[in-house]
Regions:
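Glycine-rich phosphate- or other oxyanion-binding loops that anchor nucleotides, phosphorylated ligands
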Residues: 28-196
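A short, charged/proline- and glycine-enriched loop
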Residues: 1-3, 38
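N-terminal beta1-alpha1 ligand-phosphate binding loop
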Residues: 3-28
């Protein structure tokens, strides 16, 4: 069983991590997009609540153990008043537009990545009218956490988000997600190392 479980929604979020840790496609799990080595396992869920619900429970049932740590890595939209495009943030508080739950993650002094709140939304936000979202938004983290909490203590769930936009993108085809993750790979790996 693997101790480090990395979750991404998009293949472009996963690829720099796959390369960094020298992960290979797990042939034993052809029904899921899983990449692994003897120390790390990475699942690409797909975008949105339904995709996470369809993949993550199956995956965790197969690989979870009591020493597991789950790290969700991905892009997020950010409020221009509180975030900068390309910056990585450690999520300290998580809410959603569809669950009535709020998760407050335990912090340790060792985490030097800036901390911020995240709201999981149902659909892409391309206009933050009335400044509703004050920090970050994504489409998976609350669903991932809601499922993972059935297996892991909240202290064993970590979320890292890299700001890809200021909630103003209409055409996602020009966004270089791979580069955003790649430019933050050292911060990602340092958080994973802290939990070894």
């Amino acid at each position: 069983m693997v101790d480090k479980i990395i979750i991404t929604a998009l293949q472009d979020e996963a690829n720099p991590i796959i390369e960094f840790y020298n992960l290979t496609r797990d042939a034993k799990q052809p029904d899921l997009k899983v990449y692994a080595n003897n120390k790390y396992n990475l699942l690409v869920t797909g975008v949105g609540r339904k995709k996470v619900i369809d993949t993550l429970p199956i995956y965790l049932n197969r690989i979870y153990n009591s020493n597991s740590i789950l790290i969700n890595v991905g892009i997020a939209g950010g409020n221009p008043s509180s975030t900068k495009i390309g910056n990585i943030y450690y999520i300290e508080k998580l809410t959603s537009d569809f669950f009535k739950k709020e998760y407050v993650f335990p912090l340790t002094d060792n985490i030097i990545i800036p901390k911020i709140g995240l709201t999981t939304v149902e659909k892409n936000i391309n206009k933050n009218n009335n400044n509703i979202y004050k920090e970050l938004v994504d489409m998976e983290a609350a669903v991932i956490t809601d499922i993972a909490i059935k297996y892991l203590d909240l202290s064993k769930i970590k979320i890292l988000k890299i700001v890809s936009d200021h909630m103003n993108i209409m055409d996602w085809s020009n966004l270089n997600i791979r580069k955003l993750i790649q430019s933050n790979i050292e911060s990602i790996s340092s958080l994973i190392k802290l939990n070894e």
